Amino acid sequence: MTKDECKQVVLDIIADIAPDEDLSNVKPEVRLRDQLQLDSMDFLDIVMELRKRHSIEVPEADYQQLASLDSSAEYLTPKFNALAAKS
């Protein structure tokens, strides 16, 4: 999976948990919470959806890695690729 595909996965999850948010102008380098009306429960929903939909575990200590789309892609792309290699 590429980093761009990984960013799209995160955006798809956000679109599902916060359907009223306009995701068309999200800047990948800026913290998601600074751009969108996401609270801590929404953030936990993102983590839970990554686990439910994609079997990606994000330990609490790594939550800050999901702050922006860029940092999410950096963190999640190797995890997605490791899962793909196992299948």
Residue ranges and their predicted role:
Residues T2-L38, I46-M48, K52-R53, E57-S87:
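Phosphopantetheine-dependent thiolation modules in NRPS/PKS and related acyl-activating systems
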